[in-house]
Swiss-Prot record:
Matches recorded under PANTHER family: GERANYLGERANYLGLYCERYL PHOSPHATE SYNTHASE (PTHR21235:SF22), IMIDAZOLE GLYCEROL PHOSPHATE SYNTHASE SUBUNIT HISF/H IGP SYNTHASE SUBUNIT HISF/H (PTHR21235)
Residues that, per the record, bind Mg(2+): D28, S53
Protein name: Geranylgeranylglyceryl phosphate synthase
Originating organism: Methanococcus maripaludis (strain C5 / ATCC BAA-1333)
Annotated localization: Cytoplasm
Role this protein plays: Prenyltransferase that catalyzes the transfer of the geranylgeranyl moiety of geranylgeranyl diphosphate (GGPP) to the C3 hydroxyl of sn-glycerol-1-phosphate (G1P). This reaction is the first ether-bond-formation step in the biosynthesis of archaeal membrane lipids.
Reactions it catalyzes: sn-glycerol 1-phosphate + (2E,6E,10E)-geranylgeranyl diphosphate = sn-3-O-(geranylgeranyl)glycerol 1-phosphate + diphosphate
Length: 256
């Protein structure tokens, strides 16, 4: 049996292969200025991910509107089973692998599976890993995360390898929205090397210079959210750094 990869995932893979890295902007549907954010990022992001850790109101309406404003692929990043809408293009079908609560490991995605099938949403199978300092953020609290210490990059690497053996094609190394500091470079590199699958990095990435470092270390996708909410115009410089790093990384890899 051949594994089928959907249109959105294929498009994202092509961006990563040709440009070295992709840029996702996370929009919380509960943010009052989501329209403003969508307008600012539409020319710079490769995709929009929609989600929040605490409650969601009017998800159908907000998702449809963001899709119309941006014209970009809209991917759901559900914080719970209610974070799914037929208005999206795809969903990050994920397991919060290092949660202390099996609800977030397996029960929540299982409960949402039939709804996803009913809506005909494309799924991107993904391991979601909570990295220090995620315990100080909303997702760390709600998801009861047994955070991976930054000083133990090999733990994230082994989780990522495990995810690849489970058949997942994406790993999200998450420091948490508004995190004091991002996932370190060594952890990104080890996770990429061991798993060989797409590595998404988010949380605490506030400057183009930091984004550049993360891509050069092995990140395939950079996610910004809080930064975008505070300064929507910052995405232009962020995109430049991510794409430059992507091309520099491709050149570096071609010489090996």
């Amino acid at each position: 049996m051949q594994i089928k990869i959907g249109e959105i995932e294929s498009k994202l893979n092509n961006i990563i292969e040709e440009e070295g890295a992709a840029y996702f902007v996370l929009i919380d549907p509960d943010e009052k200025n989501y329209r403003e954010i969508a307008n600012h990022v539409k020319d710079y992001a490769d995709a929009i991910i929609i989600g929040g850790s605490i409650g969601i109101i009017n998800l159908d309406e907000v998702t449809k509107e963001i899709k119309e404003i941006t014209g970009l692929p809209v991917i759901l990043f559900p914080g719970n089973v209610d974070g799914v809408t037929k208005e999206a293009d795809a969903v990050l079908f994920m397991s919060l692998m290092n949660s202390k609560n099996t609800y977030w490991n397996m029960t929540a995605p299982t409960l949402g599976a039939l709804t996803i099938k009913k809506y005909g949403l494309e799924t991107l199978p993904m391991a979601y890993l909570g990295i220090e300092p995620i315990s100080k953020t909303a997702v760390g609290f709600v998801g009861e995360v047994n955070e991976i210490p930054q000083k133990k990059p090999e733990i994230a690497g082994i989780y990522s390898l495990s995810a690849s053996y489970f058949g997942m094609r994406w790993v999200y190394l998450e420091a948490g929205s508004g995190a004091e500091y991002p996932v370190n470079n060594e952890m990104i590199g080890v996770s990429k090397k061991l798993s060989g699958i797409n590595i998404i990095v988010g949380g605490g990435i506030r400057t183009p210079e930091v984004a550049y470092e993360k891509v050069m270390s092995g990140a395939d996708v950079i996610v910004t959210g809080t930064l975008t909410e505070k300064d929507p115009k910052a995405v232009e410089e962020m995109k430049k750094a991510i794409k430059k790093a992507g091309m520099d990384k491709l050149k570096m890899l071609s010489k090996k």
